[in-house]
Curated annotation (Swiss-Prot):
Organism classification: Eukaryota, Fungi, Dikarya, Ascomycota, Pezizomycotina
Residues holding L-tryptophan: 91-92, 100, 206
Identification of the protein by name: Tryptophan dimethylallyltransferase nptA
Swiss-Prot/TrEMBL catalytic activity: L-tryptophan + dimethylallyl diphosphate = 4-(3-methylbut-2-enyl)-L-tryptophan + diphosphate
Superkingdom of the source species: Eukaryota
Molecular function per GO: tryptophan dimethylallyltransferase activity
Family per record: Belongs to the tryptophan dimethylallyltransferase family.
Outcome of gene disruption: Accumulates the unprenylated precursor of nidulanin A, but none of the three prenylated forms, including nidulanin A and two oxygenated related compounds.
Amino acid sequence: MVATPDDPRAQTIVDLFNGQGSAPAPFDVLTSALSFPTRDQEQWWRKTGPMFGQMLASSGYTLDQQYRHLTFYYNQLVPRLGPHPATFHSSLTVSGLPMEFSINYQQKGAHPMVRIGAEPIDSFSGTERDPFNQIPPAEMVNHFSRAGVKGFDPELYAYFEPKHSLTREQQARLPKEVPGGDKLKTQYAFGFDFKGDEVSLKGYSYPGLKATMAGQEVAKLVGDGVKDLKNQGKLDCTEAWAAVEAYMTELNGWGYHNLWAWDYVSPAKSRLKFYSFVMDVVDKTKLEELWTLNGRATSPAHQEGLRHLKELWDIIDLKNVGKRDLPADAPQIPEDAAPMVWNYEMTAGNPLPFGKGYFPLQGLNDAGCIQKLVKFFELMGWKDLAAKYPETIQSFYPGLDLSKTSHLLMWVSYTYSEKTGVYLSIYNHPCPEK
């Protein structure tokens, strides 16, 4: 919905086209012209939209692209974020909010890429009518299937959804049988990558929960799907999966925490990703084991990636961060532990998976984390980024003293490939007053 010609808000647009006044940010222009069908949507837009807009601007998107992606956010995501304040705890994010923002930096990329992770929510999510929020994700898939989003293909969602979804009986048992199960009610989520003019989508599911509640082995549930996709002639990642499966068994990495991910493209072009959690990465020897799947993935690209990963490990220094400032109701991390999330990416025709490590920053002083990231940027030779980064992050959170906060930077993830070189993503809290 837009402002009508006699609406005083429309004057802002007229002034801009007439060259009067200084040009406001795209978010402000849109806000002056748009209207909202509900107060919830208006609140999500006003609370999170400025940061998304600033991320786009600071990452080098053209003015046209900023308007394009902000409009996408307004039209496609804001209406699907549910009540404000949030009433459903999403297990996709550390904050429990239905979305998180991140920026990806690539050694061989043109400019940073802004991303959003989101779980669509509505007012019934978490209630007895839809306790595990299964309906809004399905509706979002159906919507994008009809919306003409370039390259969007729902086939893998249609394949995995019936295999990874909890039944109502399993949903009823989960809070009692899984630690923290009362907050583990996310079934499906989405990732949005804003690449130039386009938006690409990723999907996430929770086969670990399904296998646990169904009395199955996670390895069999996921592995059977990988093999079946090959047998159907749609996607062959069986060799890479065999390496992941063998290493997860050695690591004892199976459990209710396992996530799964794919791309919303034709299956043959999709990546598959398997996620696990390691409570304590004790040293760089363990780090190397995780990166190479205990010697199973040692290509030249893996070795070069390992070199930079060790540099990042030394700088972040998870083993010596001290006590984290975490909410009382959040899982508490022992001071001497170095927990990490890992995923392993598999693609058709490549027998070697590539790992990605996630360093948790939540509970650590934000200004201190920023300085560590600046140090890594300098080590990589990213001088302009290093010089501007503190100011850039401050622009996301105007009015906050980042030397006194510890919840704005959530994660930094690292991977490497021949195509991208170092591939670093930093995850930010989208609504810090939460």
